[in-house]
Amino acid sequence: MNIINIFIPDLPESVTDATIIKWHKKKGDKVQEDTILVDIETDKVILEIPSPSDGILNSIIADKGKIVLPGQVIGTLLKIGIKNEEKIIKTTNNVVNTDNNQNINLKLLEKTYSPTVRRLISMHDLRDVDIIQGTGTKNRLTRKDILNYLKNIRSNTNKKINNYDLNAYNFNTTHKNHRSIKRVKMTRLRKKISERLLSTKNNTASLTTFNEVNMQSILNLRRKYGELFKQKHGIKLGLMSFYVKAVIEALKIFPEINASIDNDEIIYYNYFDISIAISTPRGLVTPVLKNADLMSMAEIEIKIKDFSEKGKNSKLTIDDLIGGNFTITNGGVFGSLFSTPLINPPQSAILGMHAIHKRPVIVDENIEVHPMMYLALSYDHRLIDGKESVGFLLKIKEFLEDFSRIVLNI
C-alpha cells in the first residue's frame, strides 16, 4: 500500500493562492484516477483537482474555506491492491460509523432548544431556564413548558393570564420571523471584484461621455440575413459581433484608447484584445476575445456564446480571462437604459451598451419613431482627453448606423 499526496497545482503567475470551496469526496471514499476530488477558487476562476491515482481518500488536510498555496499538500490518497481493498473499505467505514455514533452521543448530551423555545426565552429575558422542568423527549423544554412557567410567575404576582392570551401570544410574535438576517462569506471572485472596483474609483480620473445611436440599420441587417447566417454558421447573429467590429475600427482611429498607463509610461497596444463583460452565478467576469480584429462575426458570436456557457458552469480558464485592452459591457440584456460603467484596470476605457427602445427622433425635420440606444464611454482622463473620447464614441455611432462603412473601410 502506498500513500500518495494530493497537491495544489502550479497557479498562473498573477495568482498567488487559492481557497478550498468543495470536496467532492469524503474520507474513506473509493476513487478512480482523474475523478474530481476538490474544487479550489482563485481570484479569477474555479479549478478542479483530479485524483492522481486509483485508491481510497485517506485524509483531508485542508478543509473547505482554507487558503492554500501552490505545491501545498491538501490531502492523501491510499493506493492499495485489490485483495486489501475490501478490508480497507470496511475498516474505514467502521471508523466513520464510530465517529458518527460518537458525534450523535455528544449531541444528545448537549442542552438544545427548539427555535420556538429560544424565541420565548429571548422575548421574556428568561435567565433561569435551568430551573424549568422539561416535559419533552429526553426532558427537553417545550413551548408549553415555557408558557406554563410564565403563567405561574404571573399568577404569583397576581397578573392573570388566560389560555386565549397564551395562544394568541404565539401568533402575535410570528412577525419576528421576518426580521432575520443572513451572513454569507464573500467568494474570492466577489472580493476581487470589490477590490478592483474600489481601486478604479481611487486610482483613475474616471469620466463618462454619452451619445445615442439609431439601431435601425443593424436591426434591418439581422432581420434580412439572420436566418441565412444561422444556417451557414450554426449560431444566431447577435448584436455583440456588430459592437465588437465597430469598437475595433474606432480603436484603430484612436490609439490613445487602446492604451494603458504603467507608472510614468504609456503602453500602446498594436493588437486588439477585447474583454466582454459576462454575468455568471459567481459574479461579473470579463473573458477576452484575443486578436478580435482577425475574427469573423461568426467566430465572435461563437466565442462569446462559449464564454457564456463556461461562465454559467464555472469552467472559464485563466487563459480565457487574462489580458484585454478594452471592455464592452452590455447592460441592455438586463433592460438597462442608461449607466456609467466602471473602467476595468489596467485598461483605460470601457464601452457600455444599453437596451434598444423605440423613441421619437427628428429625421430631415420630420418626427419619426426609431429603435434608439444610448452609448456610454467611461475613460481615464489622465490618458484620454475629451476630444478623443467624444470622437471615439461618434465613430462607433457612425459605424453602427451605417455598417457598410466598416466593409468599405471608410
From Swiss-Prot:
It comes from the Bacteria. Its EC number is 2.3.1.61. The active site is at 381, 385. GO terms for molecular function: dihydrolipoyllysine-residue succinyltransferase activity. The modification N6-lipoyllysine is found at residue 44. Binds 1 lipoyl cofactor covalently. GO terms for cellular component: cytosol; oxoglutarate dehydrogenase complex. It is an enzyme of class 2 (transferase). Residues 3-81 form the Lipoyl-binding domain. GO terms for biological process: L-lysine catabolic process to acetyl-CoA via saccharopine; tricarboxylic acid cycle. Pathway: Amino-acid degradation; L-lysine degradation via saccharopine pathway; glutaryl-CoA from L-lysine: step 6/6. Forms a 24-polypeptide structural core with octahedral symmetry. Part of the 2-oxoglutarate dehydrogenase (OGDH) complex composed of E1 (2-oxoglutarate dehydrogenase), E2 (dihydrolipoamide succinyltransferase) and E3 (dihydrolipoamide dehydrogenase); the complex contains multiple copies of the three enzymatic components (E1, E2 and E3). PANTHER family: DIHYDROLIPOYLLYSINE-RESIDUE SUCCINYLTRANSFERASE COMPONENT OF 2-OXOGLUTARATE DEHYDROGENASE COMPLEX, MITOCHONDRIAL, DIHYDROLIPOYLLYSINE-RESIDUE SUCCINYLTRANSFERASE COMPONENT OF 2-OXOGLUTARATE DEHYDROGENASE COMPLEX, MITOCHONDRIAL-RELATED. NCBIfam families: PRK05704.1, sucB. E2 component of the 2-oxoglutarate dehydrogenase (OGDH) complex which catalyzes the second step in the conversion of 2-oxoglutarate to succinyl-CoA and CO(2). This is Dihydrolipoyllysine-residue succinyltransferase component of 2-oxoglutarate dehydrogenase complex.
